[in-house]
Regions:
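Conserved post-catalytic alpha-helical subdomain immediately downstream of the catalytic base
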Residues: 260-329
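Histidine-anchored nucleotide/phosphate-binding helix
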Residues: 29-39, 142-148
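Positively charged, low-complexity intrinsically disordered leader regions
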Residues: 1-15
Length: 336
């Protein structure tokens, strides 16, 4: 459940101020996860609200082409949210500008969604911290969704995904403290736990690209103790530049008190948007398919590593491609 947006982006690493043309695609945190799961052969259903006009239909079609079930999408409202993405390179970071005010989902109400019907026969519900950031009414919708999911015995995952351009840390903390009481599997990056809950790893300097992996064991345990999570996953990005990142993750399983770190990939980035979402999609797939804690985090990180090589929000990879990389084949050699 979340907002599916139009993505407008200059071609060929151009800056906004020099671009004459923009590429038109779609994306959004939870939609990106749904596409990943559909590509892995899972039955993925996406829930949102979109206008009943041609642009709203184009957004829906962008999901249908990859096998996502769009039958639960509510039609109504006037706007599809937009985000403008300027891709960075080398020492110039990427820039994202939102134009989401008065979008259909931002102006939705709890009456728009019949969650009891939506959750019939469902195993897993996923949302991110981006969606409740759209406004108090959307926080209410997320809360109703979580309550219904719990009533139906559905597992709930949430990627904290703090976005400072959408709300303040204080607003995020209040809303996410409320919503996280329902969550079973929490996903965070190396900064989200600090930004939202004030929980941070020692001896870590994000901007210098210095990650203290061991410090994130404490972060995961504090999150689990605070909210009763069953599992906590934390992605660890070492940003050498906009073009080159180190990429790994940790998965903490509370029941076994097991902390598993993935191998680290050194990435040459084509498009990092959706990188965290592709991790989430990979993790959900792995957990639903009974993979061990170590195998689950390896699959999720490998899926995300591959996404960084793919243009657009969606992760266009197969299970076999992910498993091949997770198993150690990162050569990138041509397959004949």
């Amino acid at each position: 459940f979340g907002e599916l947006m139009i993505r407008l982006q200059p071609f060929n690493y151009e800056r906004f101020v020099q671009a004459n043309n923009l590429e038109f695609t779609f994306g959004g945190g939870e939609a990106n996860v749904a596409v990943s799961l559909a590509n892995y052969g899972m039955d993925a259903v996406y829930v949102t609200k979109l206008p009943a006009h041609a642009i709203g239909q184009a957004a829906i079609n962008s999901l249908r082409r990859y096998g996502v079930d769009t039958s639960k999408i509510v039609r109504g409202g006037d706007r599809v949210g937009i985000y403008f993405n300027e891709k960075g390179a080398s020492q110039r970071g990427s820039v994202c500008i939102y134009d989401r005010a008065h979008s259909a989902i931002q102006e939705a109400s709890t009456a728009d969604f019949d969650w009891d019907s939506i959750f019939e026969g469902v195993d897993w519900f996923h949302f991110t911290g981006i969606t409740p950031a759209l406004g108090p009414n959307v926080v209410d919708i997320c809360r109703e969704a979580c309550k219904a999911a719990k009533a139906h015995g559905v597992k709930i995952s949430c990627d904290l995904n703090y976005r400072g351009k959408l709300w303040t840390r204080e607003e995020a903390r209040a809303a996410m403290t409320d919503l996280c009481q329902y969550v079973d599997v929490c996903i965070s990056n190396e900064e989200d736990a600090k930004d939202v809950f004030g929980i941070e790893a020692e001896a870590t300097d994000i901007y210098a690209g210095e990650i203290n992996r061991e410090g994130y064991k404490s972060v995961a345990k504090q999150l689990a103790d605070k909210f009763g999570f069953e599992k906590v996953a934390i992605t660890l990005r070492e940003s050498h530049s906009a073009s080159d990142n180190g990429w790994s993750a940790m998965l903490y399983d509370v029941a076994s008190n097991e902390y598993c770190f993935s191998k680290k990939y050194e990435l040459r980035i084509i498009d990092r948007v959706g990188g965290g979402d592709s991790f989430g999609g990979g993790l959900i797939y792995a957990l639903l398919n009974g993979k061990s804690t170590q195998d689950a985090v390896e699959f999720a990180v490998a899926a995300s590593a591959l996404k960084h090589s793919i243009e657009g929000d969606y992760n266009m990879v197969t299970v076999s491609e992910v498993e091949k990389l997770a198993g150690g084949d990162g050569s990138g050699r041509i397959q004949r």
